[in-house]
Amino acid sequence: MKEKGKTLNGIIEAACAIAGIAPVGTSKMHEFENYDEYLKNNTATEEQLEEQRKNPLNPAPLISIAIVAKGADVGMLESTIESLQSQTYDNWEACLAFGLDDYGSKGIADTSHFRVVIASGTVKELSDLINHQLRGAYMLQLFPGDILTQDALYTLAQALMDTSSPEVVFADEEMTDENGIYPYFKPDYGRLTIMNHNSVGRPLLVAKRVFDLVGGFKGAESFDIWKFALLALSNSKMSAHIARVLMSSKRRKDVSLSPKEIDEMDRILADRVDKRANAYCVEGHEMGTLRIRYVPKRTPQVSIIIPNIDGIENLKRCIESIEMRSTYSDYRIFVADDKRNEPLIRKYLDALKKTRAAKPIEIKSGMSIPAILNYCARAEINDMLLFINGSCEIQSPDFIEELSGLASMKKAGAVGGKIIDTGGNIVSVGDVIGLRGWAGSPYKGENDDNADRLKSSFTWLQRNVSAVSGSFMAIKAQRFMTVGLFDETLSGVGWDTELCIRLMRRGYENYFTPYAAAKLYGELPDYDDASSDNLTRCYDSFRQTLMTGDGYYNPNYDYAASEPILSIKPYKPICLNPNYK
């Protein structure tokens, strides 16, 4: 079944290339203009470091650090050792593994913290060997050249004391090469995001229970590090993300995933998804990333619901794009019909009904968008609901497969596709709750290109998000009914975001995918134009997330900007909301 799926996927990928969404390779690294200034304001001071030394944590669990030093550059190894010796946290041990031929003068004098293993074998074999030498309650993997900030271990250990009792803790980092310094500000853990790329990176502190369960560190290659992170996080009861740069490492060269590595991810994915579906991976848009294909064993019947409030030309374009481009067959289109006496619309709707191309559903005149969508969803219930703005033109041939597939995942809430405007600019790539004080899409209004890796991580990867646009959204029909449909009191804006918040509170996850794309002829409603009553309801619904920040958007980013730029002094997005007092 999987091989058939991959063959079909190859055909679909070729079609997607025509639509402009085929993999394009590697983007350049993103450089933050104010990173130096940010570090000055967000790095532990000497006074704070001294305070940590004087007041050690209690409890202070033993942290075991694995370092495979086979073939290591002496200077790089020494820099890593020096960074460990300068830690304000003292309860740690480091186990270094050397090959038989490269130990030489790399002796370690500090036997209170360091233990040395000398053995023959590959880096992978030494990594396996060192796993059995670690005695700590928590494990950390470093490589020669990694440099921890002086408070790194203290900060990681401190996070373990959180009331949620995390079993995995990770932090932001920076990578360096001959061309510059590239900080990586990460989102919180998301199960879809980490299946697409290693979104947690390092430093990564893992509890012994999880470490033993997944079989320890996997090796030193990028794929090995990703695999360990994915397995550790998926087997942990809780994780924590420290939104501070705690480590600097040498940037690794971007490489494509080998067929063997992709097959290995297939096996991992098969163990993690609902057994009622076939799931497999193909290489993603960016080199070294993956795209997840989720194919339910029973093809879902899909109800496509179009509110029809944007005129006959837009409606015809929308429906024709579905009919002409879709590679999916088991769907039916439903169009809201408010019985308006416009001859062209009446003639077109009658023709749709006669040819069974779509079924008009009579609604009352003056109903709000969420009310229209709810009414149509109740009237014709199939397995899957797909809401499409009538001003959208479908761009991706397999948009139904992509959206309904991800929406069929066990934990899936709402799934949204990419929306661009007629100029090729971004309208929606998943929404951040708190952007500009309300909610919005990163990079809105900017060209849909892969200018750099940061932008591509938002616009060209399947990922967890807090909210998606209701103008191009899929959700299981039963799940939609169970959580209570769209909130009809939010008549103008926010009804889609409010549903996504409710889904997350029920334990579901919302996903964005760039592989289902639509072009919008017109504009979506904006918070700037909403009524005061509408905004008051939005504020009540969003307030909790506005207070804490969107977990899938790094808190070091400035919520006032439409794209991720650093805030020298990070703040909560509620500060931007005009209703906040």
Regions found by a protein language model. Give the residues of each.
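C-terminal, non-catalytic tails of nucleotide-sugar-dependent glycosyltransferases
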Residues: 4-60, 260-302, 423, 435-464, ...
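A conserved hydrophobic helix/loop-capping motif in glycosyltransferases and polysaccharide synthases
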Residues: 63-73, 87, 302-314, 318, ...
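Short, acidic, metal-binding catalytic loop of nucleotide-sugar glycosyltransferases
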Residues: 81-91, 162, 320-330
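Glycine-rich, basic loop-to-helix element that forms the pyrophosphate-binding segment
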Residues: 119-134, 363-380
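Short beta-strand-to-loop acidic/aromatic patch adjacent to the donor-nucleotide binding site
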Residues: 136-147, 381-395
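Conserved donor NDP-sugar-binding/catalytic core segment of glycosyltransferases
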Residues: 151-181, 393-437
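A recurrent flexible, glycine/aromatic-enriched loop bordering the glycosyltransferase active site
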Residues: 182-209, 371, 435-478
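A short, conserved alpha-helix in the catalytic core of glycosyltransferases
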Residues: 210, 221-245, 269, 399-403, ...
